[in-house]
Amino acid sequence: MSKKGKVYIVGAGCGDFELLTLKGKRCISEADCIIYDRLMNKRILGFAGKGTEFIYLGKENTEGGLIQEEINNKIVEKALEGKTVVRLKGGDPFVFGRGGEEIEKLSENNIPFEIVPGITSAIAVPEYAGIPVTHRGISKSFHVFTGMTAKENSFHDFKKIAELEGTLVFLMGVKNLGLIADELIKHGKDKNTPTAVIEKGTTGKQRVVIDSLEKISETAEKEKAVSPAVIVIGDVVKKREKFNWFEKKELFGKNILVTRDTAQGEVFCREIEKLGGNSELLSFLKIEDQMHNFNYENLKNYQALLFNSPNGVKFFFDHIPDMRVLGNIKIGAVGAKTREELEKFKIRPDVMPEKYLTTELAEEILKITEENDKILVITSDISPCDDVEWSRKYNRKFEKFVGYNTNFNLKSKTDVEKILKDMEYITFLSSSAVKSFVNSLENDISCVKRLKVISIGPSTTKTLKKFKINIFSEALDYTADGVINILRKE
């Protein structure tokens, strides 16, 4: 009989993917199979290891027990295959997450499990809106309720709820907001009680609607508030005026499309989100490591080593057999991000040009090398690195090695157009991304006209103009930070 696997019921937190716990991240990285649904940030899946099986079982809040039973059975099925299974659940597994039902099924089949708590939206979402669920002198307690009905004509005892002191929090209650407010007032709750509806909390799309308990349903409907949303009822809502912090961030409310490859795109998205912006990653490029083809023993033949991108650094050191093979070789780098990648390996570049151009790096390395020195350039298959011309011009022996390939990662035209509808800005950090983007749109760029297009530098701008795409702005320094600075000034 095959050995049973183990299941980790993991709370994925809410909205902001950095609200995932460290233990949750570890479980994800070690999983053979991950079963997830819609109520979580999909970028969390990026922490999974290579070869992980992903199973999406989306569960809208209108669907019933049939879907949950399907999920229960799938978890058991994968565990019985001997796999380490992570069941990812938005928020916390035991706060209206139906985690208990999944565990009952595991227990019936004698499958070992662990529960990893998650940050619940009942607390985190109000916090991001500047609303504390408890506050000295205002609220000594808070009470969390589901805003949905399990069965028709089956709901809460609002008489008891209306009598409670402290803050009332309803999850998944937008659809029943009018009923909730009416029932609370009917059973004695002050109609003037401050009430907040927080939509898409903890994300760059967060929106807060506030009014009295009596008027909140009408106001929310007027403002077209939709789920997912958290409803907070109580005097603590008044604290938002002073405690609101998230919506004051520089990029809050800005919807920004990132077009980089997945690895660098994730980093760029995080920088946007640190500043409160809402980023959407649509990777139009796929990076393919080629450093496994390099003979590191040949490094002893070179006097200098140049890197023109973080990817080149990463792949070079991923395969290096022994750091000592570098010997006394001089190292040059283009760009702050390339330098930062080198510093991860305790290496500081000997030269860095002020302008973030590979041609400038070729000139800079002349200062610390001599005629006829051999200089190795780790680059991509599409990088403008003319080693033959440089060798002739500078009396050095430049040799380039293609450390990685940059391939188009084409998307369907329909998918791209759908995502662009919600965007305000689109960022391009390479000519290749522009070409792949236009290819994906089948050369129909009409959907781009209303967007503010930001270019990283002259080469990318030239490519954008070639395809008749209007540029809103070009970065002053040709880096990802330069693009961020444009967004900050907007």
Located regions from the model:
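Short beta-strand/turn micro-motifs composed of small residues
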Residues: 36, 89, 117, 146, ...
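Acidic, glycine-enriched active-site microenvironments
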Residues: 30, 105, 115, 120, ...
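Class I S-adenosyl-L-methionine
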Residues: 1-17, 22-119, 222, 229, ...
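A short alpha->loop->secondary-structure connector
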Residues: 107-110, 133-135, 186-192, 323-327, ...
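Conserved anion/nucleotide-ligand pocket segment
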Residues: 152-196
